[in-house]
Regions:
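C-terminal, non-catalytic "cap/extension" segments appended to globular domains
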Residues: 2-13, 17, 33, 37, ...
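Short beta-alpha connecting loops at secondary-structure transitions
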Residues: 22-29, 91
Length: 179
């Protein structure tokens, strides 16, 4: 996920006239993924704690969570599958790799830290990235972050900081000609 942000300078060569649209969409998608990924894990906790829930009750639980984690989503029946709270079923990780989405959320939060660094100093961001990746599997996740000068996603200030930076960038982005 982090390398996707490091590749932004080459987006023009790949996407051509749509590179600006890609950058906006990529950052917005990275930011909005975190609540979705969190919702997936929250839903699994409910289902595992209450295996007696009927399919209809599980759909209702998903709808409740969607209202909390994705309040911007319109689930008013345009697509019945989504409006009925059934769209958790399209998330194969729930069946194949339960509780895996937390990994994606953590990785995305770290990638947003790199994105924020890239906005200030690309060379410095790269040196932090190399410090992070060179350690490989030799340390715990939080040790990897600390040794590379990054903040753990478990700190509220981390998510708040990257979210505010991304929101400011998205709010100021010139959308002329790309919507």
């Amino acid at each position: 996920m982090s390398m996707e942000f490091f590749a932004w300078p080459w987006a023009d060569g790949f996407f051509g006239a749509d590179a600006r649209k890609f950058r906006y969409s990529h950052l917005a998608g990275a930011l909005t993924f975190i609540p979705y990924g969190t919702m997936v894990d929250h839903f699994q906790h409910i289902v595992y704690e209450h295996p007696e829930l009927t399919p209809a009750q599980r759909h209702e639980e998903w709808k409740k969570l969607a209202a909390i984690y994705q309040p911007w989503m319109r689930l008013d029946g345009e697509i019945p599958f989504y409006g009925a709270g059934e769209y958790w079923q399209r998330q194969m990780h729930i069946y194949q790799s339960p509780f895996y989405y937390i990994d994606y959320c953590l990785a995305q939060t770290v990638s947003l830290q790199f994105w924020a660094m890239l906005q200030k100093d690309r060379a410095d961001a790269w040196s932090h990235y190399m410090a992070y990746t060179k350690q490989g599997g030799s340390r715990t996740f939080t040790e990897l972050l600390k040794n590379a000068g990054l903040t753990t996603p478990f700190e509220e200030s981390c998510l708040r900081g990257v979210s505010e930076a991304a929101k400011a960038w998205l709010d100021s982005y010139d959308l002329t000609g790309i919507l």
